[in-house]
């Protein structure tokens, strides 16, 4: 009778009850075939082997330790089937296991943990009965948290988990040493200052709201669009000011400065507004304090881009980026040698290298036990570029939806760099503030030139 393979020890070189057992390269323990019940062993000792080998009795095992007969193993047991969890009890997404008492996905697990650890208080803007599924789970934190409780997630499990982590011995730090040299420290401070001077933090703003189309999505709310486009224009100006303060940026040719600004402007705008995301209310705040919910952002002009931007904002939350990290990531987005039509891509790469090194050292100094955070931040640049590509498409459709013309600076900044000559050659092609200056051949429109004096220190950005 074959024994249960899961309880058999894995054979290796040595003896089993005094009998030599050759090693087998099976992942699962092999089953030894042909073993008869003990009572029948004596009568079978002198019979010819049925399957090409003999089955020795205990006595034979003791007296034939030098025998050349082999014991042929049976085929290994099949590997166990992978564990299949029920879908997430909260949103029905793919579950990653049992978390805090129920089958849950990584998203709902993290949301519940953060909500309990930070004692979050959410508000439902509807009737406190929102449908929570994979698509809608980020729209109402109040109802999502209530559903977490309804399906059985445990507060105590979160607290116990946190206490357990506190008692654990600290993990050894990464063996690689990251020294914050004076040069790197000075670069970080310059970028931090450039970011803070052109983009005030959320805690510095006096937030206010508007009731315009806050409940139902429409194709475009003209009043919201007018306000949003005004703030976006100011934000573009502030982005240019930020670029001019980055070490080495103004040493590039004017054409390369314009190419980089046009290519990265939307990346930086999205990154900046997403750092002003408030998950409790599912809102974003502009630099004048205007705070819009998801529906209002859609109606202000974001349209189909809205959910992508809010999803990205949620992905930034676990990174807990400060001003230095946001500024460095913005600078890396901007000063990037793989942009098309650069005159000096090698010089741009040389300017980017110290920024990458500064971000790596700063992130790993700030989070010594989490070495994976630096690559995770860099991966956000790929996400930003993907959203920006869709944002450029959205600008094209917006031109057909808005009653008037697109604000000149927004249109000019989001035009492909190949369209510069066309823009420059237009009569009356000046912006609201820059006038209709005609640039010399090979240069760019003056409204985008980093040397332009259009911006004012008092101007705020979104």
Swiss-Prot record:
PTM annotation (N6,N6,N6-trimethyllysine): residues: 347
Region (Hinge): 154-182
Span of zinc fingers (NR C4-type): 88-108, 124-148
Gene3D superfamilies membership: Erythroid Transcription Factor GATA-1, subunit A, Retinoid X Receptor
Binding site for all-trans-retinoate: 235, 287
SMART domains: HOLI, ZnF_C4
Annotated InterPro entries: NHR-like_dom_sf, NR_DBD_RAR, NR_LBD_RAR, Nucl_hrmn_rcpt_lig-bd, Nuclear_hrmn_rcpt, Retinoic_acid_rcpt, Znf_hrmn_rcpt, Znf_NHR/GATA
Modified residues (Phosphoserine): 77, 96, 219, 369
Effect annotated for changing residue 77 to A: Decreases phosphorylation and no effect on interaction with CDK7. Strongly reduces transcriptional activity
Conditions for induction: By retinoic acid.
Binding partners and assembly: Heterodimer; with RXRA. Binds DNA preferentially as a heterodimer. RXRA serves as enhancer to induce RARA binding to RARE. Interacts with RXRG. Interacts with NCOA3 and NCOA6 coactivators, leading to a strong increase of transcription of target genes. Interacts with NCOA7; the interaction requires ligand-binding. Interacts (via the ligand-binding domain) with PRAME; interaction is direct and ligand (retinoic acid)-dependent. Interacts with PRKAR1A; the interaction negatively regulates RARA transcriptional activity.
Keywords assigned: Cytoplasm, DNA-binding, Isopeptide bond, Metal-binding, Methylation, Nucleus, Phosphoprotein, Receptor, Transcription, Transcription regulation, Ubl conjugation, Zinc, Zinc-finger
DNA bind region: 88-153
Region called Disordered, residue ranges: 52-77, 420-462
Reported impact of residue 449 to A: No change in phosphorylation levels and no effect on transcriptional activity
Superkingdom to which the source organism belongs: Eukaryota
Domain NR LBD: 183-417
GO cellular component, one term: chromatin
Positions with biased composition (Low complexity): 444-462
Location of region: Modulating: 1-87
Protein name as annotated: Retinoic acid receptor alpha
Family: Belongs to the nuclear hormone receptor family. NR1 subfamily.
GO biological process, one term: cellular response to retinoic acid
Required for binding corepressor NCOR1: annotated span: 404-419
Record note on modification: Phosphorylated on serine and threonine residues. Phosphorylation does not change during cell cycle. Phosphorylation on Ser-77 is crucial for the N-terminal AF1 transcriptional activity. Under stress conditions, MAPK8 enhances phosphorylation on Thr-181, Ser-445 and Ser-461 leading to RARA ubiquitination and degradation. Phosphorylation by AKT1 inhibits the transactivation activity. On retinoic acid stimulation, phosphorylation on Ser-369 by RPS6KA5 promotes interaction with GTF2H3 and the CDK7-mediated phosphorylation of Ser-77.
């Amino acid at each position: 009778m074959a024994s249960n393979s899961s309880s058999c020890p894995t054979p290796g070189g040595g003896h089993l009850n005094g009998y030599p057992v050759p090693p087998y390269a099976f992942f699962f323990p092999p089953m030894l075939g042909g073993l008869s019940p003990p009572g029948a062993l004596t009568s079978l000792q002198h019979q010819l082997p049925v399957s090409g080998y003999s089955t020795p009795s205990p006595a034979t095992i003791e007296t034939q330790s030098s025998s050349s007969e082999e014991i042929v193993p049976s085929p290994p047991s099949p590997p166990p089937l992978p564990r299949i969890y029920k879908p997430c009890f909260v949103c029905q997404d793919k579950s990653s296991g049992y978390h805090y008492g129920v089958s849950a996905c990584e998203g709902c697990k993290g949301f519940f943990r953060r909500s309990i650890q930070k004692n979050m208080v959410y508000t439902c803007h509807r009737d406190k009965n929102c449908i929570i599924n994979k698509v809608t789970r980020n729209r109402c934190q109040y109802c999502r948290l209530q559903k977490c409780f309804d399906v059985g997630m445990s507060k105590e499990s979160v607290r116990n988990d946190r206490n357990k982590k506190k008692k654990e011995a600290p993990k050894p730090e990464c063996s690689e040493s990251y020294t914050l040299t004076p040069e790197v420290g000075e670069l970080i401070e310059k970028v931090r200052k450039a970011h803070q001077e052109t983009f005030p933090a959320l805690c510095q703003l006096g937030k206010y709201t508007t009731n315009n189309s806050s409940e139902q999505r429409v194709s475009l709310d003209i009043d919201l669009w007018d306000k949003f486009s005004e703030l976006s224009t100011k934000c573009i100006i502030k982005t240019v000011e930020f670029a001019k303060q980055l070490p080495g940026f103004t040493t590039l040719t004017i054409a390369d400065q314009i190419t980089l600004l046009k290519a990265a402007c939307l990346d930086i705008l999205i990154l900046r507004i997403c750092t002003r995301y408030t998950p409790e209310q599912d809102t974003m705040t502009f630099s004048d304090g205007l705070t819009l919910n998801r529906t209002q952002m859609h109606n202000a002009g974001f349209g189909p881009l809205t959910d992508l931007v809010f999803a990205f904002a949620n992905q930034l939350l676990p990174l807990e980026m400060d001003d230095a990290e946001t500024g460095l990531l913005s600078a890396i987005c901007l000063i990037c040698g793989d942009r098309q039509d650069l005159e000096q891509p090698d010089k741009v790469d040389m300017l980017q290298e110290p920024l990458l090194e500064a971000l790596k050292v700063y992130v790993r100094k700030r989070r010594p036990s989490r070495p994976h955070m630096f690559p995770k931040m860099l991966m956000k640049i790929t996400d930003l570029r993907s959203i920006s590509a869709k944002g450029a498409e959205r600008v094209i459709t917006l031109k057909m939806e808005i009653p008037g013309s697109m604000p000149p600076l927004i249109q000019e900044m989001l035009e492909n760099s190949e369209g510069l000559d066309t823009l420059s050659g237009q009569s009356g092609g000046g912006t609201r503030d820059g006038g209709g200056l005609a640039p010399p051949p090979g240069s760019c429109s003056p409204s985008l030139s980093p040397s332009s004096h259009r911006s004012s220190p008092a101007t705020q950005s979104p």
